[in-house]
Design a protein with these regions (language model features):
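Short, solvent-exposed loop/beta-turn-alpha elements that line the ligand-binding surface or hinge
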Residues: 35-71, 85-89, 139-145, 166-209, ...
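Solvent-exposed loop/turn segments at secondary-structure junctions
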Residues: 9-12, 19-23, 34-37, 101-105, ...
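Bilobed periplasmic-binding protein-like "clamshell/Venus-flytrap" ligand-binding domains
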Residues: 13-17, 74-101, 197-253
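Ligand/substrate-recognition segments at binding pockets and active sites
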Residues: 56-156, 247, 298
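Hydrophobic alpha-helix feature that most strongly marks membrane-spanning transmembrane helices
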Residues: 17, 118-122, 142, 155, ...
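Soluble non-cytosolic domains of exported or imported proteins
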Residues: 6, 64-71, 103-111, 196-203, ...
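Pocket-flanking alpha-helical
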Residues: 11-14, 135-172, 233
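Periplasmic-binding protein-like
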Residues: 1-48, 59, 64-72, 109, ...
C-alpha cells in the first residue's frame, strides 16, 4: 500500500519525458490498447472504473493514484512499521535494486529513483540500495534471487488481458513473473506464518484470473471479470506499476498517422504516414494529440 499510494515518481518520470513527466504514469498492470469490449471501451478503463479512477484525468500536476490522499501515507507507514517490527524486521528496510554496471544513464535514473524513495518514504522507513551486475540480470541477479524488486515490462503477445494477468498467478508453470521475478511461486511452496495474508491474497487473485479466463463465450463478461481481478491485484499491491516507457525522436513523420498495433508485425509497415519536409515541433504534436484524442472519443 505504501508503494502504490505513497511514491511520487514525477522526477523519475522526467528522466524519460522532461516535457510532460506524468504522461509516463502507469497505474495499471495491463497496457492500454490491448483489447476493447463490444461497446468500444478500452480494457484498462474498466480497471479504472473498478478502482474509482474513471473520473480522474491527466492534469500534468499530480499522479492519479496519489490524489485521494495527497501522497500522505503516514498512517500506512506507521501500521507497516508496527507489523514488520513485530516479526523482527529492523528499519530502515533496504530495498535492493540492480542496474547494469556499464551504464551511466542507468545510474542516473537509479539515483533519481533513490531520491523519490527518500522524499516519499523518509529515510527511516525504506531506502533504495543501488547494486550493479556486469552483464546478465538473469544469471547474476534473478537466478540467485538477490533483488528486492525489479522494474520490468513487456508488450502484448496477443490481444487479451490474460496475456498480462496470467504472469502473476500461482500454480502455473507458465506464470513467468511469479516464478522468476517476485518468486512468489516458490514462497507458496512453504510460506511462513507471517506470509499467510499475502498468500491468501495471491490465491484469491489466482482464482479471479482463472475464473475470468474460463469465460470464453461472452467477451464483455470476460473483460469485466479480468478488470475485477486486476483491480484486486492493484488494490492489494501484489505488484506496483511504475511507468510507461517511451522513445524520443526528432522526426519528419507524424507518429499519430502511423499504424499503432499493440501486438503483431503491423507497426513495421511504413504505409500511409503523414510526413513533413521540416521536423515537427512540440506545438504541432500537441495539436496532433488533441485531434487523435478527439477522433478516438468519437
Amino acid at each position: 500500500q505504501c508503494f502504490y499510494k505513497g511514491i511520487n515518481f514525477t522526477n523519475y518520470y522526467a528522466r524519460t519525458n522532461k516535457i510532460n513527466p506524468l504522461k509516463c504514469e502507469n497505474d495499471y498492470y495491463t497496457m492500454p490498447g490491448v483489447c476493447y469490449n463490444t461497446k468500444g471501451e478500452e480494457y484498462t478503463t474498466l480497471v479504472a472504473k473498478e478502482m474509482g479512477f474513471d473520473a480522474e484525468k491527466y492534469d500534468g500536476e499530480t499522479m492519479i493514484r496519489l490524489r485521494a490522499n495527497g501522497g500522505d501515507i503516514s498512517a500506512l507507514k506507521k501500521q507497516a512499521m508496527e507489523e514488520l517490527s513485530a516479526i523482527g524486521v529492523t528499519f530502515p528496510v533496504k530495498a535492493t535494486y540492480f542496474i547494469i554496471a556499464s551504464s551511466t544513464s542507468a545510474l542516473d535514473n537509479a539515483t533519481i529513483l533513490k531520491q523519490c524513495f527518500s522524499d516519499s518514504f523518509g529515510d527511516d522507513f525504506i531506502k533504495l540500495d543501488i547494486q550493479t551486475y556486469v552483464s546478465s540480470l538473469t544469471q547474476e541477479v534473478r537466478t540467485p534471487q538477490l533483488q528486492s524488486f525489479v522494474i520490468n515490462g513487456w508488450s502484448a503477445d496477443f490481444g487479451d488481458p490474460v496475456n498480462f494477468l496470467g504472469q502473476e498467478t500461482l500454480h502455473d508453470d507458465n506464470a513467468f513473473y511469479s516464478h522468476y521475478y517476485s518468486n512468489i511461486a516458490r514462497v507458496a511452496e512453504a510460506p511462513a506464518d507471517y506470509q499467510k495474508d499475502l498468500m491468501d491474497a495471491f490465491e484469491q487473485y489466482t482464482d479471479l484470473v482463472n475464473a475470468a479466463n474460463a469465460i470464453v463465450n461472452d467477451t464483455d463478461a470476460r473483460y469485466e471479470a479480468f478488470a475485477k481481478a486486476e483491480a484486486y491485484m492493484l488494490e492489494n499491491v501484489l505488484v506496483s506499476p511504475t511507468y510507461y516507457d517511451i522513445a524520443w525522436s526528432l522526426t519528419h513523420a507524424n507518429e499519430y498517422s502511423k499504424i499503432n498495433a499493440m501486438y503483431g508485425p503491423c507497426n513495421y509497415k511504413a504505409v500511409n504516414w503523414e510526413t513533413s519536409e521540416e521536423a515537427y515541433t512540440t506545438v504541432q504534436y500537441e495539436q496532433f494529440a488533441k485531434a487523435f484524442d478527439a477522433a478516438i472519443q468519437g
